[in-house]
Amino acid sequence: MNVEELVQRYSAGERDFSIIDLRGAVLEEINLSGAILHGAMLDGANLRRANLSQATLSGAALKGADLTQADLSGADLSDAVLDEAILEGAILDSAILDQADLKAANLAGAVLSEADLSEADLEAANLTGADLEVANLHQANLSKAALERANLEGANLEDVNLAGAKLEDAKLEDTVLESGDSTLIS
């Protein structure tokens, strides 16, 4: 299936595009709100400013994909692979990212308020200025992550690996840190 066919089928009311292969495709500003893209292969795809709100992207491959300013609010990205993906300024509020792989992803300025990032791998991710208010990061790997100026107010950081993470000027009011790595600033 190509991009044109995807758009036509979505416009006709179809929503299940599981395991679709659109690696490297240009999907800039596409509206796939509520689409089922479970296991989709979207490595290197251009999804800048795409509307993927409430979409199911569980198990999707998005390595190196560009999701700059994309709307992923309420989306299910559990077990998705987003290594080195660009999510700068993306909206991920209330998104499900449990066990997602976000190693070296760029989430600078992203909105992740109330997102579920439990057991997510965010090693060396850039979360500078990101909004993680009331996010669940239980057992997440944030080693070597850049969290400068991030808003972590009320976030759950229980059993989180923060080794080498940078949290200068981060907002940490009401943050839960029990059993986690208490070395917050390296």
Describe each PLM feature range.
Residues 2-186:
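Tandem repeat scaffolds
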